[in-house]
Amino acid sequence: NNLAYNNEITRTGKGGIIIIGGDTKTLTPGNSKADNNYIHDWSEIYQTYQPAVTLEGVGNICSHNEMENSPHEAITYKGNNHIIEYNLIHDVCLLSDDAGAIYSGRSWVWYGNVVRYNCIYNVGSENHGPDGIYLDDAVSGQKIYGNILVNIPSNSIHVGGGRDNVITNNIIVNPGNNALRFDDRSREG
């Protein structure tokens, strides 16, 4: 039950806001929120895996934030039942390839997360082609809808394995490689 609200965060050596809360065993929500923050020019020393907002645990929210000008990801989340909505994300992943402006990965059990109504544009740079929204290495049970993705150099939305992911009603303009990419890297054998 914590709130990071209406802050400007800039020139950090690492990331911006880290929210860890809730109980993954009982799925009790943390009810913490990063809302209406302006986060820019972060990760000046540690340039990867230091996002503007990190959500971990259960039932936390990242909403109405603007994030820009970073070498790597804007939002990373781990756990269940998080909501990521109404964020404006641009000019991120400027020095990264195997990444996403919004990223989660490597768990079959992180069901119930919702990524909706975000605007993501101008991701990557001339020499780097990351994804817009990247569900990596078997992350499952995600709902991705109502997002606007523009000028994403690799895959606008990339689902790297996993199951029970629902991708609907997104607007994708000028994708690089693919608007949507699904692969079976972690399919059941």
PLM feature spans:
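Structural detector of coil-to-beta-strand junctions
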Residues: 15-16, 50-52, 73-74, 99-101, ...
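Asp-box/WD-like beta-propeller blade repeats and closely related beta-sheet repeat scaffolds
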Residues: 21-24
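Right-handed parallel beta-helix
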Residues: 2-14, 28-43, 59-73, 80-94, ...
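Acidic, glycine- and Ser/Thr-rich low-complexity intrinsically disordered tracts
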Residues: 182-189
